[in-house]
Swiss-Prot record:
Subcellular compartments: Golgi apparatus membrane
Membrane topology: Single-pass type II membrane protein
Top-level taxonomic group: Eukaryota
Family listed: Belongs to the glycosyltransferase 31 family.
Any GO molecular function: hexosyltransferase activity
Membrane-spanning residues: 20-42
Pathway per the UniProt entry: Protein modification; protein glycosylation
InterPro entries: DUF4094 (IPR025298), Glyco_trans_31 (IPR002659)
One record GO biological process: protein glycosylation
Lineage: Eukaryota, Viridiplantae, Streptophyta, Embryophyta, Tracheophyta
Essential cofactor(s): Mn(2+)
Protein name (record): Probable beta-1,3-galactosyltransferase 3
Function: Beta-1,3-galactosyltransferase that transfers galactose from UDP-galactose to substrates with a terminal glycosyl residue.
Entry keywords, A to Z: Glycosyltransferase, Golgi apparatus, Manganese, Membrane, Signal-anchor, Transferase, Transmembrane, Transmembrane helix
Length: 409
């Protein structure tokens, strides 16, 4: 076969004849039809449900069982109000149980973070902490931290001979009643100096100190309080943590009985609640350098527990431990603690038995059967000349000597 171009003949360059072209096209067409039919055929399955029939059957089943939407609505309208109230109560109880569980988990998380922080900072975890992390750990009722200073040796001795059990009795108090009592003190500006060595010798004799990683100083009481709660909650697992000054008389059994009444409550902040003026004038006692944060001159502080004695529950102590690096400190320690809680959902409990006066006030109340938890003189922010007078206060206002051993917590 040839092709004529401009009068010349050339041989054909077609490689495929018309016959072969026709056969290839026809074969491709047939293959395409076969493939298309295979793709679009829907296989019949015995297991595949028929939507319309199944939906109708389920609807009929629901109606037969009394679950028709109209029937359910009518039941809700005609339901007994008392039954509804019962269900609401059950739901409320379930929510409370869940809230307790969440609080427990939060406390365990805070304790775990405190332990982790101790490891990161290179501080060894105490034996008490190790025991606390084991299954069946000991839960104490309360930890009582007695705030003291290097110069208060006479006050400490007077406390040991009055309301604070010493020696074997103190150990028995811990084992049988779950009450920990310690004098709380940090270290001097020159660590390892004569003041620190004096405390170490006293602690070796009595074994009743809780040493803090804190530099002692009157203007550092807010920081000391924060460090105390953070240290105590990581060292002992207790329901309550108490702070008291070393010039205050305390009836331990009455304190324990008071706290037990609030053990089912969450985020407890207990003390003698007060509100005083914000002092902006320099040079006066209780001057507040950041007075401008509390509003105009003449304003008063928000309600907070007086600093002589107060108690907080474990969840609040854990909160302080967890957030200690961001909690702001004001000049006055009791105001500072109240400020940490002012924005939280805290249960404030005002109990005036925590701030009785010295005799005759606390004596009259004791004779009437209303024994005070704590006694001190407001004019001195503690018992005036406490080292000399606390024995008299204990004699006239103290609970019976065996009260703590008869108490059930």
């Amino acid at each position: 076969m040839s092709t004529k171009i401009k009068g010349e003949l050339f041989p054909s360059r077609s490689l495929v004849s018309k016959k072969w072209t026709f056969l290839l096209c026809f074969g491709s067409f047939c293959f395409g039809i076969l493939f298309t039919d295979r793709m679009w055929i829907i296989p019949e399955s015995k297991d595949m449900p028929r939507p319309s029939v199944s939906t109708e059957a389920e609807r009929l089943k629901l109606i037969s069982e009394g679950c028709d939407p109209k029937t359910l609505y009518q039941k809700e309208v005609n339901r007994d109000p008392q039954a509804l109230f019962g269900e609401v109560s059950k739901t409320h109880n379930a929510i409370q149980t869940l809230d307790k569980t969440i609080s427990s988990l939060e406390m365990e998380l805070a304790a775990a973070r405190s332990a982790q922080e101790s490891l990161v900072n290179g501080a060894p975890i105490s034996n008490d902490m190790e025991k606390k992390q084991l299954p069946g750990k000991r839960r104490y009722l309360m930890v009582v931290g007695i705030n003291t200073a290097f110069s208060s040796r006479k006050r400490r001795d007077s406390v040991r001979t009055t309301w604070m059990p010493s020696g074997e009795k103190r150990k028995k108090l811990e084992e049988e009643k779950g009450i920990i009592i310690r004098f709380v003190i940090g270290h001097s500006a020159t660590a390892g100096g004569i003041l620190d060595r004096s405390i170490e010798a006293e602690d070796k004799k009595h074994g009743d100190f809780l040493r803090l990683d804190h530099v002692e100083g009157y203007l550092e009481l807010s920081g000391k309080t924060k460090t105390y709660f953070s240290t105590a909650v990581s060292k002992w697992d207790a329901e309550f943590y108490v702070k008291v000054d070393d010039d205050v008389h305390v009836n331990i059994a009455t304190l324990g009985e008071t706290l037990v009444r609030h053990r089912k409550k969450h985020r407890v902040y207990l003390g003698c609640m007060k509100s005083g003026p914000v002092l902006s004038q320099k040079g006066v006692r209780y001057h507040e350098p950041e007075y401008w944060k509390f509003g105009e001159n003449g304003n008063k502080y928000f309600r907070h527990a007086t600093g002589q004695l107060y108690a907080i529950s474990r969840d609040l102590a854990s909160y302080i431990s967890l957030n200690q690096h961001v909690l702001h400190k004001y000049a006055n320690e009791d105001v500072t603690l109240g400020a940490w809680f002012i924005g939280l959902d805290v249960t404030h409990i005002d109990d005036r038995r925590l701030c009785c006066g010295t005799p005759p006030d606390c004596e009259w109340k004791a004779q009437a059967g209303n024994i005070c938890v704590a006694s001190f003189d407001w004019t001195c922010s503690g018992i005036c000349r406490s080292a000399d007078r606390i024995k008299e206060v204990h004699k006239r206002c103290g609970e019976p000597e065996n009260a703590i051993w008869k108490a059930r917590f």
